[in-house]
Amino acid sequence: MNKLPDGWTEYKLKDIMSISSKRYNPNKDTKNYKCIELEHIESETGILNGHTNSKDIHSVKNVFEKGEVLYGKLRPYLKKFYLAKFDGVCSSEIWVLKGKKVINDFLYYFIQQDNFNYIANVSIGMIMPRADWSYMSEISFNIPPLDEQKRIASALSKIDAYLENTIKLIEEKERFKRGI
């Protein structure tokens, strides 16, 4: 068996993250929030492509806060994840994840790894497969100490920002070329 790096610890998922149970009922709550549905989250990128307003919805939604991690539990093979940049509500098919022994910025990148995706795809349902938290919560992962989580999340965040800026530049050049 391989020895863990210094400071790293093996934890079950249920010990490093939890799923929020806060709900928004449009029939009882009058506050208006941005509402994220699965179709608003781009697969494999963490990019949000729009939202609706909670005043326009009729079903109960999950509540999330800025900095929490959203993960699409329906059809987990689509790899839909988002690090919330605002408070809002989302589809009940999206888990709102909160770090317990991990910081949320690290958690956002943690759920993108192949190992996490693999266990998320051991799902319930044939036609509409969903990630199974009761199964997933018992799986163990090796987790770095807090200071290393911060370094990892910071480095990956800088790479994401660079990629996002590069994509914007390419899109601008494409628009410019079409305009000529």
Ranges and model annotations:
Residues 1-8, 158, 165-180:
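Short amphipathic coiled-coil heptad-repeat segments
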Residues 1-25, 142, 146:
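Non-catalytic DNA-recognition/assembly elements of restriction-modification systems
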Residues 14-25, 31-66, 84-85, 89-90:
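Sequence-specific dsDNA recognition surfaces
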Residues 6, 74, 89-95, 124-147:
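A short glycine-rich beta-alpha junction/loop motif
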Residues 149, 164:
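Alpha-helical interaction elements
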Residues 58-114, 132:
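A short beta-sheet element
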